[in-house]
Amino acid sequence: MDGPPAVALGVEKKHGNVMNRPPRPVDEGLPNRNDIWLIFYLGAVMVTGTLLVFFLAGGGLETCDGLPLSDGTNLPFDQAACDAGVETEISKWESYADDKFIHAQTMTLSVFIMFQLFNVMNCRSQEESIFSLGVFSNKAINIAFLVSFALLLFFVQLADFTIPFTSFEIGGLLSTKVLSLNDWGIIMAVAILVVVIEEFRKFIVNSRIFAIDGRR
């Protein structure tokens, strides 16, 4: 779903200081070292946030034998029942496990996509803040963002909707389930961090404190 926003970056207008930059060395690769560092740095932010949401949503449940719930051969555990040595009701806990894990998967998918959409804003410039560029100044990105977000909402919030003339639910296409407003609040709060952290980096880089010979 990040395809349309990525394409929309191609119509980003040139920025005011582009002619003030020295030319790239002829032997400099694409991506260069700075590009590679940014890829790993922002990638680490998004991976960390995605894993955090997965475990906050209950994806890290364990079984009585201490193995992850993601191992399909295991059942989630009721700690009190395990401590007492009481055998759990398999069918009940299987149903709980499936529902809990699909919920975690849906939140993980959603936050990963939102990370990508918000990161498109970062990619408009490696040096300039999106606020100085104008958050909504690239109309193509705005439209692409809304279209991609609408598709995400379609597959998540209409997960229980049965496709006409079939018995197949939309959620079955991507193994999603409907999320609550609170879930979306967590997703947005975590995903927007990729913009906050990158804006802080740009502020530090552009700060006069770190300027060399008066250049920024």
Where are these regions (language model features)?
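C-terminal transmembrane helices and immediately adjacent loops/tails
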Residues: 1-216
